[in-house]
Design a protein with these regions (language model features):
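Short, intrinsically disordered low-complexity segments
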Residues: 24-72, 99-148
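Short, charged/polar surface micro-motifs in flexible loops or helix N-caps
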Residues: 13-16, 85-86, 118-120
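N-terminal secretory-pathway/extracellular module detecting exported/lumenal segments
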Residues: 75-77, 87, 94, 137, ...
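N-terminal first-folded block
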Residues: 17-21, 79-102
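Exposed alpha-helical structural elements
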Residues: 18, 48-49, 91, 123, ...
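A hydrophobic alpha-helical transmembrane-helix feature that marks the membrane cores
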Residues: 2, 18-21, 149
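Short glycine-/aliphatic-rich beta-strand segments at the starts of folded cytosolic domains
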Residues: 2-13, 72-83
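Charged phosphate-binding loop/patch that engages nucleotide di/tri-phosphates or the phosphate backbone
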Residues: 150-171
Length: 171
């Protein structure tokens, strides 16, 4: 049997029948608020998954797909919280910004952080969860293989980029 790779999928927007059907076709399992995880063959990458998924999304929806990295030698942290109406996430957002450099993304509740902090994600999640007003938080490590879609425009992370501004390639 071949090697497999774990992907985390985060979605912001109206959950449509098309999105639900696409997740079912992938074999993805829900693991957080409008987030799924899926195990795929080793040769799979985030950008083609985003390209395929965007055909199933509304024009104003956003999607991030990232290859999960289960070690403390991760490339990035992926932090996601739910969006409870009226909740103040300011303290949580301040703490996330202190973890490292936040990659600018068009998401309200999803952050990718380039961090030198090698604390395990369970401990980070517990600490950040104390600052989350609704105690609904997900923290995981991800590799350099991640991409996102904002409407009709998709971008993939380019690992060789020297600075955050040159970090993406449109596809």
């Amino acid at each position: 049997m071949g090697e497999i790779k774990h992907f985390q999928i985060c979605y912001e927007g109206d959950l449509t029948v098309g999105v639900s059907h696409a997740m079912r076709r992938l074999g993805a399992e829900p693991n957080f608020d409008q987030s799924w995880q899926v195990w795929l063959a080793e040769g799979r990458h985030a950008a083609p998954l985003v390209r395929w998924m965007r055909t199933q999304m509304d024009a104003d929806a956003r999607l991030l797909v990232a290859s999960t990295q289960f070690t403390t030698a991760r490339d990035f942290l992926l932090v996601r919280h739910s969006l409870t109406p009226g909740a103040d996430y300011g303290e949580l957002h301040d703490a996330v910004h202190r973890l490292g450099v936040i990659v600018e993304l068009p998401f309200e509740s999803t952050f990718v952080v380039q961090s030198d902090d090698r604390t395990d994600v369970q401990t980070l999640g517990l600490a950040l969860g104390e600052l989350c007003p609704d105690a609904s938080l997900m923290v995981t490590g991800i590799s350099h293989d991640w991409a996102y879609c904002d409407g009709g425009v998709s971008r993939m992370h380019v690992a060789a980029a020297e600075d955050l501004a040159g970090m993406f390639r449109e596809f």
